[in-house]
């Protein structure tokens, strides 16, 4: 099929590669505009743009895809299908209706659960046992279109937002190619979503990562994993930002208040929470590198009985 591909982050790259490898003709790649990054504010390509250019595919980077001139530009490519994977802009009805096979989206959840942004991180934060990817024919709503195919993934006990991102990116790429084959063969079935079962997720912000030590240890540990590698869970120690990259749930003690560092060993640091405690495994003090707790304690003195900021 002749394809227009729309996507922006690393998550989208695997699907673009899979479509190319499957022998489809990618006529155009649409991605978000380049953004300045780093201290030097150097303009950086999106991961999808880098992939497209490596394959010699034309790239289009509109600020607003819904503008009339941009819609007419897309129309010139006479695509059979538009594939959308984490593009980052809402498509107008005129774009949705443009290709004969419609616009197909790969969404990183088992719809109708987790419509919206950041479904990968929220699956970890909420302690889900399973999640997955869904392909759907897009309509004017946000992740409300008719479903075509699903693939389920089990979360590992130590699953992080980053590791689940990689799993679902690979699974989504595979499912997209399978979905395209069903559409081309005329065997695709379109199942409406049950809106009564729908749940919605919100964007992940840096502020979400601030650890509330009054919450149960189980919830905090899931937050730590879900926000690894971005934006990370953090607290404050002696006025400095202190990131927690990994921790284990342990039994706590009613003798200590939440946030109290009640035990410091050679390689251990135990923190009381609202229910249970956490043994910190990998940490990072402001201005320092990530390191295991033992390495941190050898280079930084922490008083037993001191507190992280609540």
Curated annotation (Swiss-Prot):
CDD domains: FMT_core_Met-tRNA-FMT_N (cd08646), Met_tRNA_FMT_C (cd08704)
Residues holding (6S)-5,6,7,8-tetrahydrofolate: 109-112
Primary enzyme class: transferase
Protein name: Methionyl-tRNA formyltransferase
PROSITE patterns: GART (PS00373)
Biological role: Attaches a formyl group to the free amino group of methionyl-tRNA(fMet). The formyl group appears to play a dual role in the initiator identity of N-formylmethionyl-tRNA by promoting its recognition by IF2 and preventing the misappropriation of this tRNA by the elongation apparatus.
One Gene Ontology CC term in the entry: cytosol
NCBIfam families: fmt (TIGR00460)
Gene, per the UniProt record: fmt
Reactions listed under catalytic activity: L-methionyl-tRNA(fMet) + (6R)-10-formyltetrahydrofolate = N-formyl-L-methionyl-tRNA(fMet) + (6S)-5,6,7,8-tetrahydrofolate + H(+)
The enzyme's E.C. designation: 2.1.2.9
Sorted UniProt keywords: Protein biosynthesis, Transferase
Family: Belongs to the Fmt family.
Originating species: Agathobacter rectalis (strain ATCC 33656 / DSM 3377 / JCM 17463 / KCTC 5835 / VPI 0990) (Eubacterium rectale)
Disulfide bonds: none
Record carries keyword Protein biosynthesis: yes
A Pfam family recorded for this sequence: Formyl_trans_N
Record-level Gene Ontology MF annotations: methionyl-tRNA formyltransferase activity
